[in-house]
Every structure is written in C-alpha cells, then in structure tokens.
Regions:
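Dinucleotide-binding Rossmann-like beta1-alpha1 core, especially the glycine-rich loop
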Residues: 55-131
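Mid-domain catalytic core of redox enzymes
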Residues: 29, 226-350
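C-terminal catalytic lobe of FAD-dependent flavoproteins
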Residues: 330-392
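Active-site/ligand-binding neighborhood in enzyme catalytic cores
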Residues: 96-101, 106-242
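Glycine-rich FAD pyrophosphate-binding loop
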Residues: 24-53
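Short alpha-helical segment within the catalytic ATP-binding CA
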Residues: 21
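Beta1/beta-strand and adjacent pyrophosphate-binding region of the FAD-binding site
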Residues: 3-18, 35
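Glycine-rich, N-terminal phosphate-binding loop of Rossmann-like dinucleotide-binding domains
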Residues: 15, 247-249, 361
Length: 392
C-alpha cells in the first residue's frame, strides 16, 4: 500500500440492492464520492438478471425475483429508476399427478377433496382436521404443520416439499421453523397481497445500472474486500479512516472468530425444451418426494409482454434444489436456529465496536429480506447511520 491511493468518501462493499441504495443516496444528498466493490463480476447482488439469447427469456441468475411492496416510500423510490410491468405472481404445485393453485385456497381445497365446499364449510373441515393434535404442544415441524392445516393438506403440499428444502425429515425439524401456513377460504390465488407488484420493465440489471448512473460513483468488480493486495481492503480502509458500508457475511468480516452462521443454499439445473412453453406458468412447485427438486422456474412466463421478441419454439427451465450451505457456497436463507440467533447476537456486539462500518443486507445482518425490505432498511440505514458518519 502506498500513500498515492486517493480514497473516496465512502466505500460500499457489495453491489446488491442495499449497497446500491446507500451509494445512490449518499451521492444525491451529500455529493460525496463513493467506491462500490463486489467480489462477483456483476452488480445487482442476488437480483441480477441477464437475457438468454436462444429463448429471449430474462434469466434471474439467483432464482426467481418478484418485486412487491405495500411501502409507499419504497415504491416511490424504485419508480425513479424503473417502471414495472403489470405482472401478478401466481404459483402452482404438482401433487400426485395433478396441478393445484397455491397458496392453499378454496380452489385447492375443493379440487383436493373433490368437493364444492363453501368458505364456511371449508374452514370447518380444516379446523376439524387440524384438531387432530388439539391439546398438544407440537414438538417438531411435522406436528406443527398438522396442527395448523390438518394432516391431509399438510402431507400433500407441505411435508415432502419442506423435507426437500431442508434435506431433513420434518419430524426432525424444530416446530419454530413455521409460524403459520396461509390458507385462504376464497378463490384468490394471488401469491402476494401487497399493494404494488410487478417486474422491472427492462430488467433488473438495467434498473440497478440507473441507480448508480453518476460520475461520483465508481464500481470495481471481481474485488475481494479481504484481499490485502487491492487498495480498498478492510485493513487499509480502517487505517485510512474511510467509512464502510459492508453487506458481505457478518461472520466473515470478523474472520469467523466466534464460529460460522448457518445458511441454506440453492443449486440450479438448466433444462431446455424444444417448445415455446413447457409449464404454462412461471413457477411450478413439486410437492412429492419422488421429484428431487423443490420447484421449476420457466423464465419466459414472467414476461408475457415480451412475447413477440421471444423464441416461439424454445424455452428454458431451471430446476431448483435446496441444501445446507458450506463455506464457498452462495448463502440464500439463514437457518436461524436458536444457536444461530445467539451467535449472530454476539457478532452484533462486535459490530458495535466498529464505528466506521455500517452492516446491512441479508448477509450483513443475518436476516432473510425480500427486495422491498432490503431497500427500506437501506434508506433507513443511510439516514440514521451513514449520513451522520459522512458529516463527521
């Protein structure tokens, strides 16, 4: 390291939605210079997408990303950088040779039981089936699921899907993993209930490029914060007194000194079909144990408004497999056992002793966030933590 390095006013580690939002706000509000570094070769974090030339599909590289929010502040903010399609997310599940709508609703119930229950009749049925374990304290996820929606629906749609997600028999999983299982006693199969919903009209990556389209923001990709050979490394920035917004894994920041936080990860297997549409929907869950993957994503079906620019004779599907993450895997979902929560609380105490570093995002705070929640927490963190640091 030489004295010749001219440091920016702020370094953001991670070019995901949290980091991009903070960088955009810092430049807009204070006119500072910001350097964003990311170990990956693209911006956008897990929301990054790219176009598949053969099919005309927009591939969500890290799995399906659907934007939805009821937060007016977030909706107004994101609409500064993109407009959204009218896409409404609906999910279907294949079970025992039939396709059902999800979340479980009156249509699912009547199809499953070959009936035509009214809302009140369906509710009475499910309450009765859920009463199988009445008076007991569920000791595992299996019992909790049955106590919430009854054995027939739980075993059809939840049990094996959950076993595949966790690679563990639900009877061996803690009941605390599920707080509730939504059942709708009407025919509404909209997946999300938020006020606003859609997909960015010209893609996720174009949206995020516009967020940082400012000469005062510089992005350096394929750059590791912990690599001492590059100028924006942890030790050099600390020595120079440069404020840092860190969105990488919080345990990695502290060199795993207290132990590793546990995550689940996802693997994808790509399948191409010589037909224009394979599933007829964007996401198909597979609820049965004999299909090894949890769900399949058919990306073309997220964007029906692009039909004319898509290949009518080809489609691409990603099958999604879930497993426990090991070091080096992409962490997706925090496992959040009681031991993990206690470990994160100890890392949080260490973080408080880092006055020039603001921790954020899923990895930096060991939380699962939807996109709108990441943006909301980033706007708040900028106002409450980052701007005061920059004004010192």
């Amino acid at each position: 390291m030489t004295d010749a390095v001219e440091y920016p006013d702020l370094v953001v580690v991670g070019a995901g939605l949290f980091g991009l939002t903070v960088a955009q706000q810092a430049v807009e509000r204070l006119g500072v210079r910001v350097e964003i570094i990311d170990v990956r070769d693209h911006i956008g974090g897990n929301a990054y997408s790219y176009m598949d030339e053969e099919t005309g599909a927009e591939i969500h590289k890290y799995g399906a990303h659907l934007f939805h929010t009821s937060n007016r502040r977030v909706w107004d903010y994101v609409n500064r950088f993109t407009s959204f399609t009218s896409y409404v997310h609906r999910v279907y599940a294949t079970h025992d040779g039939e396709v059902y709508p999800l979340p479980i609703n009156l249509g699912t119930i009547n199809q499953f039981f070959h009936a035509r229950y009214t809302p009140a009749e369906a509710k009475a049925l499910i309450d009765g089936q859920a009463g199988e374990l009445a008076g007991t304290d569920p000791q595992n996820l299996n019992d909790k699921g049955i106590s919430l929606i009854g054995r027939p629906l739980y075993e059809a749609f939840i049990k094996n899907y959950t076993a595949k997600q966790w690679q563990t028999d639900p009877a061996e999983l803690p009941a605390s993993i599920i707080k509730r299982l939504p059942v709708r006693f009407n025919y509404d199969n909209r997946y999300f209930k938020d006020t606003w919903e859609g997909l960015p009209r010209d893609g996720y990556t174009a949206w995020m490029e516009r967020m940082i389209d400012d000469p005062r923001i510089h992005v350096t990709l394929k750059t590791d914060f912990f690599d001492g050979s590059q100028p924006f490394n942890k030790a050099a920035l600390a020595a120079a007194g440069v404020p840092v917004v860190y969105t990488g894994p919080v345990d990695r920041y502290f060199d795993y000194s207290l132990g590793e936080l546990k995550w689940r990860t996802v693997d994808f297997r790509e399948v191409r079909y010589d037909e224009g549409d394979h599933f007829g929907c964007p996401v198909m869950n597979f609820s049965d144990a004999d299909v090894p993957y949890t769900r399949a994503i058919e990306f073309k079906n997220f964007n029906p408004e692009r039909h004319d620019s898509q290949n009518p004779n080809k489609t691409v599907v990603w099958e999604e497999y879930s497993r426990f993450a090991e070091r080096g895997d992409e962490p997706y979902y925090p496992i959040n056992t009681e031991a993990d929560k206690a470990l994160y609380a100890r890392y949080e105490e260490l973080a408080k002793a880092e006055p020039l570093t603001v921790f954020g995002g899923r990895l930096g705070t060991y939380k699962y966030y939807d996109m709108h929640q990441v943006i909301d927490t980033a706007l708040t963190a900028y106002e409450e933590q980052v701007e005061p640091l920059l004004k010192k």
